[in-house]
């Protein structure tokens, strides 16, 4: 089981690293259409993971509350939304294809704020993987090793385009390929670290597991709505973003059911 957990924690990080490596062998920056497609795919995976891997299990763990089984999921979901809203307001960051930084005023370099933007929404993804594996380790009936692996694989799949989306623009901004690759990898490093810290607290987390699952879901949905959907929809020919969103959602749903 320990090997499965370690693998599960590293799989999403591997996805980011492989995506970031695209900068080493691709000669040209990603076109706007490709960026929209990849962003839509990532949004679809994150949305499906939030529902199938986090919110539904959270409600399943709260069945003892009867008709109020939705309550922990609702409370955790809103705390996740508000937590990301707070981070979004405080941490200086710059979204792709944006000229104006968000968060508190800062003298950070433009490229640093681009990395922080991706790192910001990798936090809930790392938490999600860690919480699910914590549930597996503590013997929760609603958490299975297969379901945890499905979530890790789903996030790894959507991390691949994310890694490319951050490393390629960093190179276009003037960074060397090595530094651009390092920036992409660094943006994903928060995921295994966050997941590991969550697992180390596993024994204390079981009573509040439904709240934590839905907390991670709320944080991920915030990222999808606030960042990914606008990026995949802006400009002309945004249909590709919608189509890839649907592909990502379907793939994550299949993974969760097939492996869970």
Where do the language-model regions lie?
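Intrinsically disordered, metal-sensing/regulatory segments
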Residues: 1-260
């Amino acid at each position: 089981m320990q090997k499965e957990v370690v693998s599960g924690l590293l799989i999403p990080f591997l996805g980011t690293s492989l995506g970031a490596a695209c900068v080493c062998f691709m000669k040209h920056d990603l076109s706007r259409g490709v960026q929209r497609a990849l962003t839509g795919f990532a949004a679809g995976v994150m949305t499906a993971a939030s529902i199938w891997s986090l919110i539904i299990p959270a409600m399943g763990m709260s069945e003892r509350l009867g008709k109020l089984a939705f309550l922990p999921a609702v409370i955790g979901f809103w705390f996740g939304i508000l937590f990301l809203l707070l981070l979004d307001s405080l941490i200086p960051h710059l979204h792709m294809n944006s000229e104006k930084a968000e968060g508190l005023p800062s003298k950070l370099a433009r490229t640093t704020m681009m990395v922080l933007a991706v790192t910001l929404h990798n936090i809930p993804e790392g938490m999600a993987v860690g919480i699910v594996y914590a549930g597996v380790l503590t013997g929760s009936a609603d958490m299975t090793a297969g379901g945890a692996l499905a979530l890790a694989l789903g996030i790894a799949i959507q991390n691949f385009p994310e890694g490319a989306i951050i490393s390629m623009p960093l190179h276009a901004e003037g960074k060397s390929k090595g530094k651009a690759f390092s920036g992409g990898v660094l943006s994903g490093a928060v995921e295994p670290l966050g997941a590991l810290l969550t697992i180390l607290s596993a024994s204390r987390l079981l009573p509040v597991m439904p709240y934590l699952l839905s907390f991670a879901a709320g944080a991920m949905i915030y990222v999808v709505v606030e960042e990914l959907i606008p990026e995949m929809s802006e400009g002309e020919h945004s249909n590709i973003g919608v189509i890839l969103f649907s592909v990502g959602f379907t793939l994550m749903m299949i993974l969760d059911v097939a492996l869970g």
